[in-house]
Amino acid sequence: MDGVSPKFVLPETFDGVRMEITGQLGMIWELVKAPVIVPLLQLAVYICLLMSVMLLCERVYMGIVIVLVKLFWKKPDKRYKFEPIHDDEELGSSNFPVVLVQIPMFNEREVYKLSIGAACGLSWPSDRLVIQVLDDSTDPTVKQMVEVECQRWASKGINIRYQIRENRVGYKAGALKEGLKRSYVKHCEYVVIFDADFQPEPDFLRRSIPFLMHNPNIALVQARWRFVNSDECLLTRMQEMSLDYHFTVEQEVGSSTHAFFGFNGTAGIWRIAAINEAGGWKDRTTVEDMDLAVRASLRGWKFLYLGDLQVKSELPSTFRAFRFQQHRWSCGPANLFRKMVMEIVRNKKVRFWKKVYVIYSFFFVRKIIAHWVTFCFYCVVLPLTILVPEVKVPIWGSVYIPSIITILNSVGTPRSIHLLFYWILFENVMSLHRTKATLIGLFEAGRANEWVVTAKLGSGQSAKGNTKGIKRFPRIFKLPDRLNTLELGFAAFLFVCGCYDFVHGKNNYFIYLFLQTMSFFISGLGWIGTYVPS
């Protein structure tokens, strides 16, 4: 050992150990890959392809139906009896039914004036209209502001009631349920619900109530949402594309074929008798609106969607608010499916094909499969096949089917078709949270009943005056508050897969993977939407 310095021996020793460990890991990988990894990953590919075909068939079916509806279907006022309500000097207002307008609120500092003002401006006899502001706010300042606004309208002769509760049991469902128990509501035949940021036009009731008056089998009339801030940022444009497809296609198809669709929670008119017959509002899930709609439908009630009747509203413009909203909208339906699937199967009032539509199309494919296949296939399985080239993915499954589905989804918002590519990448990012939420709902895990009110900033054109107190900060200075570790983790995973495919692959998936990596990375850093510090 004379003349040999330890500093030259130790690095070689570590190098040898490192090479030995790497060699052992490589050997274990080769031993496990063929008998275990390859079959499991190939099975995952087949399952994802099956889900893709299911989603494609659903989209094609709805595409065909919506074309037939637009070309040959009669308009709602031709399919159902509709007679406008005319003012009569002799009868006065007695030919108008008594209507209740409910406006649930929770700390709506920026938008509370919008819905209250719009509701008070509805063209309806004042003695036949009751406006009920259900304020669950926990901020005393906001509560005082809302109460003062109600008093201001009451001084003008509007029949407006300001209601508060001692607790927030049941959240929105609890507030709506409590509101219907008030003594002054017993004379009301119909109830209209508007969230705090919704602004109905003055003729809203005159265009919708006659359908309920002259068609006793209709329980719900749903209006379409229109968005005052869709051009605020890229996040709101992406939301507009998804929601426009929902209203233009999904709601229209459900209304035209089975007289069933999910109540959207706002901008809808219910027959109070139908609510009571269905068991009233329930707070067992975070989608009390869908829960009531399914229960009412199982009792034979019909629903009508009016695409021409539009109500202005606001989209969440912060990524944090949007994520909470999507968690609720994804977790709630999955949880409701778990609770009601057997009740739907056993129901004897609803025909067989309507049961199939509700269970398979409405719940299983749209609320569960659509999220799972988007995330599992395009964000997990497809990248993993790059690391295991023995697993093959047919081009019709990886390219053709998603392309067709994307094109069919684009019909709702033609003006944003140039953003279609960005929308795909963004939807893949959001599928991570939606998949997680559906699993939480199906297994009724910890956050299954988490209710976070979607924060609105009053950022639409008609609400600019309400945003003076909002400070928007440059994005780069607030990174610690905006980091989303889940997205950043998937960005790293997809980047590794993309680099491996760039060096060793033959399918050129790295182009998609690098673009998807950027989308996850941007979302992970919170560089999307507007930013308002908490």
Curated annotation (Swiss-Prot):
Transmembrane segments: 36-56, 368-388, 404-426, 483-503, 509-529
Listed EC numbers: 2.4.1.32
Pfam families: Glyco_trans_2_3
Residues that coordinate or bind substrate: 195, 197
Membrane topology classification: Multi-pass membrane protein
Entry's Gene Ontology cellular component terms: Golgi apparatus; Golgi medial cisterna; Golgi membrane
Location of the protein in the cell: Golgi apparatus membrane
Keyword vocabulary terms for this entry: Cell wall biogenesis/degradation, Glycosyltransferase, Golgi apparatus, Membrane, Transferase, Transmembrane, Transmembrane helix
Family: Belongs to the glycosyltransferase 2 family. Plant cellulose synthase-like A subfamily.
Purpose of the protein: Possesses glucomannan synthase and mannan synthase activities in vitro. Mannan synthase consists of a 4-beta-mannosyltransferase activity on mannan using GDP-mannose. The beta-1,4-mannan product is the backbone for galactomannan synthesis by galactomannan galactosyltransferase. Galactomannan is a noncellulosic polysaccharides of plant cell wall.
Protein's name in the database: Glucomannan 4-beta-mannosyltransferase 2
Source species of the chain: Arabidopsis thaliana (Mouse-ear cress)
